[in-house]
Amino acid sequence: MSLLNPYFGEFGGRFVPQILIPALNQLEAAFVDARDDPTFQTQFNDLLHNYAGRPTALTLCRNLTAGTRTRLYLKREDLLHGGAHKTNQVLGQALLARRMGKTEIIAETGAGQHGVATALACALLGLKCRVYMGAKDVARQSPNVFRMRLMGAEVIPVHSGSATLKDACNEALRDWSANYDQAHYLLGTAAGPHPYPTIVREFQRMIGAETRRQILQAEGRLPDAVLACVGGGSNAIGMFADFIDDASVQLIGVEPAGLGIETGQHGAPLSHGRVGIYFGMRSPMMQTAEGQIEESYSLSAGLDFPSVGPQHAHLNSIGRADYVSATDDEALAAFMQLSRQEGIIPALESAHALAHALKLIHQQPEKEQLLVVNLSGRGDKDIFTVHDILQSRGEIQ
């Protein structure tokens, strides 16, 4: 019997080996208990404020919108300790793991931001840390790999399958199946088996709560739309959660179109996938005609995931949120524009959301609109990737 609803409409659930059911039940009970405990909430909020640096700023982009009637704000999760929104919910889950008496943390990572956040939380709270990472991602995210190792984490490259996030998730689950007595699986996104999608949303929802307060203070009204990139979907659900009941606020999630939807080289299961069971949940995913998981692709490692969190699937199915996509080239152009015009280097993941915002702005420059983009992370980790692309194009030496 679940303490919390395991489904979002028809999506979600808990499709895992029987051996993991007790661990998931224990996690759900511990979360409900901690959620209702003022002492836990005080500890969590103290870490968010004094260690992670919350609240993060809401920054008006005057240069990007010059010559238009749009006011565009960025929610600056890139300023958070660790460099991305990942730190929020990792601190929450790590505190929860310690409360449950766990001594080890298992995690997966794509871009490395979740791995870095997990490593810093484990160092802070005295927990042993091992992080699974696709071998391709280890190669393209070497700065984050070194950061994790500097903070004492064991980084384990995964060579199976596509050697990306999907495969790292599979290996992390195998490890947890063998070690759940002493280890907590610190899942990095709002996906997977119940209760993870709910836990991650609740530990990320301060993004939207702060944005709501800040935009009302700055503009005296709610935004017309909030935008966020969507891989598994944690930064987006953190931004959306406090606006879901506001019918006047459009929720826009931006999936990676990769090399173009028509090429098949993308990571857009909400727009172009089919519903199935994967990673312990029922949700849309990229599948072959035979029902096998199809390899996803994105220039941004953190969006290179073949499925999506179940609450996003539900919001999409009921028409409450709109899910669009941006290509590698569009994200790269937005990355360069923000860097050169506002002096802010975004993560390539976040640049997907910005790319769609810029499209909306320039399609109707005369339209008076108030937009907020969740700048989910900073782009330090991506500078070598971008350098190599610009060099290959002959745009830099």
UniProtKB/Swiss-Prot annotation:
Domain of life: Bacteria
Catalytic activity: (1S,2R)-1-C-(indol-3-yl)glycerol 3-phosphate + L-serine = D-glyceraldehyde 3-phosphate + L-tryptophan + H2O
Name of a matching Pfam family: PALP
InterPro entries: Trp_synth_b_CS, Trp_synth_beta, Trp_synth_beta/beta-like, TrpB-like_PALP, TrpB-like_PALP_sf
Family indicated by similarity: Belongs to the TrpB family.
Pathway this chain belongs to: Amino-acid biosynthesis; L-tryptophan biosynthesis; L-tryptophan from chorismate: step 5/5
EC number(s) per entry: 4.2.1.20
Xref: PANTHER family: TRYPTOPHAN SYNTHASE, TRYPTOPHAN SYNTHASE-RELATED
Cofactor names: pyridoxal 5'-phosphate
Subunit structure: Tetramer of two alpha and two beta chains.
Record keywords, A-Z: Amino-acid biosynthesis, Aromatic amino acid biosynthesis, Lyase, Pyridoxal phosphate, Tryptophan biosynthesis
Name of the gene this protein is made from: trpB
Record-level Gene Ontology MF annotations: tryptophan synthase activity
Record-linked NCBIfam families: trpB
Gene Ontology cellular component list: cytoplasm
The protein's name in its UniProt record: Tryptophan synthase beta chain
Organism whose genome encodes this protein: Edwardsiella ictaluri (strain 93-146)
Residues bearing the modification N6-(pyridoxal phosphate)lysine: 86
Gene3D superfamilies in the record: 3.40.50.1100
Record function comment: The beta subunit is responsible for the synthesis of L-tryptophan from indole and L-serine.
Enzyme class: lyase
Residue runs in coiled coils: none
